[in-house]
Amino acid sequence: MKKNTMKKYMSSAALGLPLVLLLAGCHKTPEISYAKDVEPIIKKNCVECHLQGGKGFVASGFLVESYESLMKGTKFGPVIVPGDPLSSSLYRLVAGEVDKSIQMPHGKDPIPASQITTIENWIVQGAKNN
């Protein structure tokens, strides 16, 4: 009897394991596109202050007019560390992981959580110009 029970268990495991592995792969984050996903968030929430002559540009030297200017960062250094959102000040500023007085967008409603997650995932995926 023990042999039959063990055989049933092994059969169930052999059938179930591939299914579990398949389902685990279904939750992979899709590739985030700078042009399609991130740039619209930046344009909607950051452009007003971070263009030439804007208050954000004057204070920090940070322009968001292109991918290149975004990756260049501020006069103090880069704001994005590809692969590492927690070391990326852009992510930390919009995610509210800083003092409220410097949270971005400054003086406006916070960026929706889903859009912050998009920025985070884009950085995790290497902050590519795609």
Question: Whereabouts are the PLM-identified features?
Answer:
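Hydrophobic alpha-helical segments, especially transmembrane helices
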Residues: 8-9, 116
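Short, surface-exposed loop and linker segments with low hydrophobicity and enrichment for Pro/Ser/Thr
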Residues: 11-14, 27
